[in-house]
Amino acid sequence: MSHDPLSDHKRLIREVASIAGLQVVEPAERREWPQEMAQEAFIGLPGDFVRLIDPHTEADPVALLGNFLVGVGVLFGREAYAVADGRKHYPVEFLLAVGDTGSGRKGTATGRVMPVLEAVEDNLASRVLSGLSSGEGLIKGISPTEEETALPDEVRRFLALLPEFASLLNVMKREGNTLSAILREAWDGTRLRVLTRKEPLDVDNVNLSVIAHVTPEELLNNLTATDRCNGFANRFLVMLVRRSKLLPEGGGDVNISPIVGRLHTAVEAAKGRGLVERDKLARALWADEYERLTRSREGLRGALCGRAEAHVLRLSLLYALLDSANEIRPEHLQAACAFWDYCERSVEHIFGGASGDTDGEKILNALASGPLAITDFYRLFGNHRDREWIQAKMAAMVRTGKVVATVKAGDRKESVAAWSLKGTVRE
């Protein structure tokens, strides 16, 4: 039998990971794809749109559905809303489509939805944003012109298309960049402000929907611990997408007029709607689902799925508005739950068992090469961590049982205090 060095390498990685208490996560494309989105999500007008377009495109049906639901939120503006704990939730959502470059067909799905939206609202193209780089720039881009300031109560409705989401993540890493904070405020529906400048920027009544694209590798490599834990990432519906079929001759044109007509009717019906509540049966269903949606989740999954109930509320509102319904009915809530459940499975698939503690993971990976002393940690973190932080962090990791205190030869060959992975040295 021939020797397989690759198998030896994989076995070594798993042994080290076992010692460190880590889970080895296979690349996304090698792991089984998440269970498909339940058919309950494909109801009403959005479901009919997907069924109309799907035979003629390589885009993933879930990507078509996600783009449609998030995109139409721009058309509804603030004419209708739902309420949770005294807070208004408008039909605004952020979608993050995660798929491989090219074969993920992320842009293809967006390209199929935009003609429908633009057919319903002629001037929508003028309110599509791209290339966001700062909170200040975003506010300037959506602020009313001098001619428009005479209408202070007018809702500013915009759609941000971000096909290079990784670039946005990198921009947000710059010191003093306010884009993350402003996007979070936009999702919340609050006034957008940047006050730390001579001429403060301020705009209110903004409905901003976001459709972004990224590859799994870009997301894993560029989403910082801050983005994961400060509520930025969990404001997005994270959705794994892939090519649904091969169409060597390309997808053909589709008559979207019936969809456009029905969507126009739904938008008109929503005008002046105001508060949209769940009907009696939907309230009973919500009571059953609420505990599941708000349950505590561990690690990174918990950080990225921390707004499950808010997403389901907004999605159910969108489904109801697209049905021209006066109330959120059980089928709207079931559709929203089915959509969200796929997003949560996508997060689990992409991030696996990651803990969300990037510093801790960095330390464990470094300790796999041998014991480390204080000076080694200085180098590991580029002198951005002081002695007090290192000692506190290592004490916490010792308490987890994954790391033990030991000694090693210092830079001048003297014995110095150090730490190692449990089981790799004599304690």
Question: Which role fits each region the language model picked out?
Answer:
Residues S2-E427:
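Phosphate-handling catalytic cores of nucleic-acid transaction enzymes
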